[in-house]
Design a protein with these regions (language model features):
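Short hydrophobic/aromatic patch on the recognition helix
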Residues: 33-44
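C-terminal peripheral helix-coil segments that are non-catalytic and often amphipathic
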Residues: 124-132, 136, 143, 152-184
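Hydrophobic alpha-helical connector segments
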Residues: 53, 64-97
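Basic, helix-initiating cap at the start of DNA-binding domains
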Residues: 1-32, 49-52, 74
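Short hydrophobic clusters on alpha-helical segments that form packing/core surfaces
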Residues: 8-16, 62, 66, 91
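Amphipathic alpha-helical segments used for helix-helix packing
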Residues: 85-119
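Alpha-helical DNA-contacting segments of helix-turn-helix folds
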Residues: 16, 51-58, 66, 118
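Amphipathic alpha-helical packing segments from all-alpha helical-bundle domains
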Residues: 60-63, 103, 110-136, 140-147
C-alpha cells in the first residue's frame, strides 16, 4: 500500500498527463489520492513543494534507469554506440511516459514548474561511462560524440522515428562514426 506521499505524487503525475501544471488544483490532487487537502499541505507545504517533489522523483527515477541501461549495455559487451543507444532507448520511452521528462529534455525551462537540466545530466553520465569503459577513446572525442548523440536523441523525442529501434540504430551509428573518425 503506497504512503500518502506516494499517493499524492502519483495523483499529481496523473493530473499532469491531462493538463498543464498551472491548471492543476491541490484539492483535486488530494481527492484523487484519497487524502485530505490538509494532508497534502502537511506533506508538501505548497503547490511548489509538491512540484519540486514530483520533479525530483521523476528525475531520479529517469537517471537511475540511465545508469542501469548503460551498465547493462557495457556488461553485455556493447560498443560505445550500443551503450549510447541503450540510453537513447530509455530516454525515448521515458519522454513518452512523462511530460516532466519530455519537458526537461526539450527545453521546457520556462514552464511551471521549473524543470531540471536532464540533458546535461544524461550527457555527463554517458560520457563518464564511455570514458571509463573504453579507455582507448579520447575523453574530448567521447564528450563531443555524446553531445551530438544527445542532440539526435532529443530530436527523436520531438519528432519520433518510425520505431524506437530505428532511432537507437541511428544514434549508435552516429556515435560509432564520430568515434572512428581520425582525430586531428
Amino acid at each position: 500500500m503506497p504512503t500518502a506521499r506516494d499517493a499524492l505524487l502519483d495523483a499529481a503525475f496523473a493530473a499532469l498527463g491531462n493538463r498543464p501544471w498551472t491548471a492543476i488544483r491541490m484539492v483535486e490532487v488530494a481527492a484523487a489520492a484519497g487524502v485530505s487537502r490538509q494532508t497534502l499541505y502537511n506533506e508538501f507545504h505548497s503547490k511548489d513543494g509538491l512540484a519540486a517533489a514530483l520533479i525530483r522523483r521523476e528525475s531520479e527515477a529517469y537517471l537511475v534507469g540511465v545508469d542501469q541501461v548503460l551498465a547493462a549495455a557495457a556488461r553485455d559487451g556493447g560498443d560505445a554506440g550500443e551503450c549510447f543507444a541503450a540510453a537513447a532507448g530509455w530516454t525515448l520511452r521515458n519522454a513518452r511516459r512523462s511530460p516532466l521528462i519530455r519537458g526537461a529534455l526539450t527545453g521546457g525551462r520556462a514552464q511551471r514548474p521549473p524543470l531540471p537540466d536532464l540533458a546535461g545530466a544524461l550527457r555527463t553520465r554517458v560520457t563518464d561511462v564511455l570514458v571509463r569503459e573504453f579507455p582507448r577513446l579520447r575523453p574530448d572525442d567521447v564528450a563531443w560524440a555524446c553531445e551530438a548523440a544527445l542532440r539526435l536523441t532529443v530530436s527523436y523525442v520531438i519528432t519520433p522515428a518510425p520505431t524506437d529501434e530505428d532511432a537507437c540504430l541511428r544514434v549508435a551509428q552516429l556515435v560509432r562514426s564520430l568515434l572512428s573518425w581520425p582525430a586531428n
